[in-house]
Amino acid sequence: DDEEFKPFMSYLTSQGLWTQWYDTNSSFNESKAAWLRDEEHGRIHSSVFVNYGNNGKRMNSWALANGYDPYKEVFAGIEANQTGFRSSGGVDQGYASKENHSPLTSIALFTPSDHYQRGLDDNIQEITGRTDSARPFMQQQPYQWMIAQRERMYFSGMKQDVTQTGSANGQANPAVGVKGSGWVGVADFAPARSVIQGSNFWTNFSTGKGMRSYTKGAVSNTSEWSDMGAQSILPSWQWWIAGQGGTTLKADFDYGEEPRVDLQGKEVALPYSPVGAYQGGNSLVLYGQAQQAQTIRLYKTNLDVKGNSTAEVVWRAKDASTKARLALVFADKPGEVVTLSLGAASTDGWKDSLVDLSDFQGRTIATMGLQVEGSGDVQVNVGKLAVSDESATPAIPAGFRIDELTTDGEMNVSWQKADFASVDSYILEAVDASGNVHHLAQAYGDSRYVKKVDLEGSYMLRLRAVGKDGSISQPAELVVNRSALPSELTYATAKDSNGNFTQAATSGQVELSWKAPASGTPTG
């Protein structure tokens, strides 16, 4: 009922909620615009979602002629799952021109993950006839590499190269279930955006999941995990690799040993030698041929270089003869790539290379990346990339405490979080009696639930803050002595009179007993 719905939505919008109206009208016209604002209600919705099959040029013209903002108020809907990779979905019909791919309205991508993720099962069934009624393939670990490629194909174009977007009819990737495509790639009409600014930045390339956890290159937890709070800033472009002889290098995320299968469910080998992470669950891996230097642009940035600024790259190579360089593009010379040597390669563990940037004081870094050169099959893993002005190391976390600890290892801890402007995240670890580090969690916040700390006896609980340049604070520490805790908590039970249900042994009473810790009987 318009008489009730419009004033209701007008009220929600006026209170600061961003709202959007959708109906099956595939045009932006008077009927659609009536859901944006009118004389009686004022602003009703913040924007409208125009149904699929729309025409960006006509919508832009009508909006401008009638006083509407074609970018703030008009979103052209693109139904991703309906056409999949087969067509452009009509997004190119809304380009400014054949040469200028700037959309004439905003774009609303509807359920893209349905087709690059959920659509994998449809493609496997279509190609092989295989299904899995117990658990979809898209949820099984051995198929995740396919979903990662399909996601990059959706956003970066069929060739997973942001410099080669656009309709690629006939371009196929049969290994991941894509037989042909007309999809243009989001990068064809949306330039990279970035939150990287100021004078400090860091990333460990964490995708927020892992087959295991690593601390300074060593495995610190053998459990598979997923935690978006631990995700680092990922590359702005996936991928942008160039060389004089063409692109011969490839890029991926290296999780260490991981299972992979093909569309038939048969095991396939990784295309690189798995290394794993320096910190977190994965590193960036560059592999392939690089007889001619290959430059990979990774991050769009707006970083100010100061007199004491340095860049840090933690990396390793498969071959000692491989050369790696930091590759920078400055805002005042966007057509020039400045390369700075990272020194000799390390083939035995990770190398921490520091690069002095003081010669570039006063300039702004617009792009950060790497350049790789070497003979034969080259592989370089990168575990950290950072820029620092030496001002971002945070203080020791304050107020660290254990709020709850159970005998089976569950734990709730809390602390006083610092402002996000100065602290990127917090690392929670346990250090056992032998000095081994056991990674528990990493995220920004002021509390954490740990499902199980699988350690016996005494151990040290350690909390460290990570700064905006990746520097790490001194730890806040708590000693946990498991032997000082009560154990074997039980309560007296009995069957009811019919022998069917277990209940308290004495009606109206709960009788508890436990094994006292070695240090004595609890006093409260």
Predicted regions and their residues:
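Short carbohydrate-recognition loop motifs
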Residues: P259-T295
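Extracellular beta-strand ligand-recognition surfaces/modules
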Residues: V313, D352-L385
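Substrate-binding cleft of secreted/luminal carbohydrate-active enzymes
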Residues: V74-R260
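Chitinase-like catalytic core of GlcNAc-active glycosidases
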Residues: D1-S61
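Beta-strand-rich modules
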Residues: Y449-P475, G524
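Extracellular carbohydrate recognition and processing domains
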Residues: K333-T364
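Pro/Thr/Ser/Gly-rich low-complexity, intrinsically disordered linker/stalk tracts
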Residues: D389-A421, G470-P522
